[in-house]
């Protein structure tokens, strides 16, 4: 469960600070690079990559985005319960058990030729509604979707379900985030093949979407009429191989405070397994945050944090709820610690953490689930 109550700030020594102004800046920059005929959906799956789906969506709608995209039905339901009436697309295939809910909350769900359609038809009919769906096309990601050569047959099958309406179609590019766009362009060629079998493509309002963050940045031919920016909403670029790097900001800061300072004597070990041994007498400090909060254990003896605008090394193994760092004479109990983001002139970017633990910044931000959030405007 994630928390977004201002009161939590007064109860927790560790929290995530989300800068609304930085979020708004990114949303505005991305929207400004796209022509007016290309709509933007804000990808707010995984609670907006840890930034808070509802707050991100509120700002996105103010900045000209027309819809939300989430991974699962329950994420779409959460947006509806928070009062959002804009179109909400889900990106993952729904199960038959989710049919009633998808219809009830007016979600636009993906269906391909592997989905059992009868439960969705029955749910829509029983509720007196038309279920809007969009068709995922597998152009090479090999995750979900109908293959281009099977589209015509699938469309014929869909005619048997009068309470299911095709709202649009989409595909996902697997290698648009590298310099060589050959594979991405081949995927778009396959998408065009699939589109050629869809007479609906000529209808007003029919959604055609292929541009993920990498496509938004580097491939105007992928924009069609709906762009799906995801990671770039939150600061990081898809990779360091992008041809275009925009002026994006990082809204997220992970903050904690020093709870303990001590002197570690020469020859003494610290933490589980004693993986760090002091070569001389030294001051160390303890921070009440650990891998249960989503801070990677692989940063043990490798990562850094910021205290008083200076970098301090993580020493010993990161524990479930606590971790230890080197501490200079100026480090005191109660001092602010920044584990992700800016403090003074120093910054720890999610890309830095991702490089150390051999992952991507998406996972770094999405994994911080236990820590409460607060919002600021700066």
What are the residue ranges of the model-derived segments?
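Active-site-proximal beta-alpha core segment in soluble small-molecule metabolic enzymes
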Residues: 14-17, 24, 38-209
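Conserved PLP-enzyme active-site core in the AAT-like
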Residues: 33
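Active-site anion/phosphate-binding pocket segments in diverse small-molecule metabolic enzymes
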Residues: 2-5, 9-20, 24, 75, ...
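Active-site phosphate/pyrophosphate- and oxyanion-stabilizing loops and adjacent acidic/basic residues
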Residues: 28, 156, 362
């Amino acid at each position: 469960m994630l928390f977004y109550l201002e009161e939590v700030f007064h109860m927790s020594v560790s929290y995530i600070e989300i800068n609304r102004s930085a979020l708004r800046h990114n949303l505005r920059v991305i929207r400004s690079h796209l022509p007016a005929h290309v709509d933007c959906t804000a990808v707010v799956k995984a609670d907006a990559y840890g930034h808070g789906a509802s707050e991100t969506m509120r700002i996105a709608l103010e900045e000209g985005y027309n819809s939300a995209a989430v991974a699962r039905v329950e994420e779409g339901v959460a947006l509806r319960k928070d009062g959002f009436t804009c179109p909400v697309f889900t990106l993952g295939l729904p199960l038959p058990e989710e049919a009633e809910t998808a219809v009830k909350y007016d979600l636009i769900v993906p269906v391909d030729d592997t989905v059992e359609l009868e439960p969705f038809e029955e749910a829509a009919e029983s509720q007196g509604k038309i279920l809007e769906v969009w068709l995922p096309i597998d152009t090479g990601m090999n995750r979900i979707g109908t293959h281009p050569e099977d589209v015509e047959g699938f469309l014929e099958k869909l005619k048997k379900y009068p309470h299911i309406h095709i709202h649009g179609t989409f595909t996902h590019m697997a290698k648009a985030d590298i310099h060589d766009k050959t594979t991405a362009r081949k995927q778009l060629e396959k998408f065009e093949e699939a589109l050629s079998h869809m007479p609906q493509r000529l209808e007003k309002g029919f959604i055609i979407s292929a541009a993920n963050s990498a496509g938004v940045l580097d491939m105007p031919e992928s924009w069609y009429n709906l762009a799906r920016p995801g990671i770039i909403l939150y600061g990081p670029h898809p990779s360091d191989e992008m041809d275009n790097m925009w002026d994006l900001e990082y809204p997220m800061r992970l903050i904690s405070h020093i709870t303990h300072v001590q002197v570690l004597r020469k020859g003494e070990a610290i933490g589980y397994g004693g993986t760090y041994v002091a070569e001389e007498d030294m001051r160390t400090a303890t921070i009440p945050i650990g891998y249960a909060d989503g801070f990677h254990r692989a940063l043990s003896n490798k990562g850094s944090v910021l205290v008083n605008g200076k970098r301090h090394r993580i020493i010993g193994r990161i524990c479930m709820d606590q971790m230890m760092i080197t501490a200079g004479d100026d480090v005191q109990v109660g001092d602010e610690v920044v584990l992700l983001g800016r403090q003074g002139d120093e910054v720890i970017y999610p890309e830095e953490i991702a490089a150390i633990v051999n992952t991507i910044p998406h996972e770094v931000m999405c994994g911080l689930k236990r820590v409460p959030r607060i919002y600021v405007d700066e």
